[in-house]
């Protein structure tokens, strides 16, 4: 996400768990378009309401304390939080059954947590955010698209379930957009 945003003129603050993340960012992004900080995502080194928009993709399901991560994202956002998660109401229902097959296809698959829309909405509401908007990305499991490595074919595969409304009902991962209530100042709660 950082590359297209920086190409559109955005100046970014990127965090990661290791210095190598900053090295990777520097290899892909124009100099002067970002700052990088190695830090603990469960205790971000930024002030409350530090950023108008906070993005977090492909991380939430891999963190043991997902509620702590979401709390921190909400804390440092003054307006919008965007993130994604794997929804339990999808092909992920077969996650435990098919994990070994998925791992054999992808090689680097890690275990992950599945969430419901209700869990996500409840967590966001607790941190002063309006009910979120949910955008399911894919009907077919992401492993299928990664294995194909053909964006055009993936779009063709995804079109019928999208037209039929199946992606809206059963798609995953889900991109979430939540907007902070302007009248609700940040309440830190437990840290």
Residues covered by each model-derived region:
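Class I SAM-dependent methyltransferase SAM/SAH-binding core
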Residues: 1-43
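A short glycine-rich, Lys/Arg-flanked "PGG" loop and its adjoining helix->strand segment in the class I
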Residues: 67-82
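Short catalytic micro-motifs in class I SAM-dependent methyltransferases
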Residues: 58-59
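Conserved class I S-adenosyl-L-methionine
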Residues: 79-107, 111
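A conserved beta-strand element that flanks and buttresses the S-adenosyl-L-methionine
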Residues: 55
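A C-terminal cap/extension of S-adenosyl-L-methionine-dependent methyltransferases
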Residues: 133-191
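Short N-terminal helix/helix-N-cap motif within the alpha/beta-hydrolase-1
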Residues: 3, 64-68
């Amino acid at each position: 996400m950082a590359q297209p945003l920086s190409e559109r003129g955005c100046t970014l603050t990127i965090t990661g768990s290791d210095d190598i993340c900053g090295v990777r960012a520097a290899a892909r992004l124009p100099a002067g378009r970002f700052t990088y900080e190695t830090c603990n995502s469960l205790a971000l080194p930024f002030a409350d309401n530090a950023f108008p928009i906070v993005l977090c993709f492909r991380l939430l399901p891999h963190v043991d304390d997902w509620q702590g991560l979401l709390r921190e994202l909400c804390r440092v956002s003054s307006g919008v939080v965007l993130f994604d998660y794997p929804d339990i109401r999808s092909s992920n229902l077969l996650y435990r059954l098919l994990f070994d097959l998925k791992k054999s296809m992808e090689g680097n698959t890690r275990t992950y947590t599945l969430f419901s829309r209700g869990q996500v909405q409840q967590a966001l509401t607790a941190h002063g955010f309006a009910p979120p908007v949910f955008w399911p990305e894919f009907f077919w499991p992401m492993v299928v698209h990664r294995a194909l490595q053909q964006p055009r074919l993936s779009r063709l595969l995804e079109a019928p379930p999208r037209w039929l409304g199946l992606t809206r009902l059963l798609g995953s991962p889900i991109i979430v957009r939540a907007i902070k209530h302007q009248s609700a100042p940040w309440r830190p709660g437990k840290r």
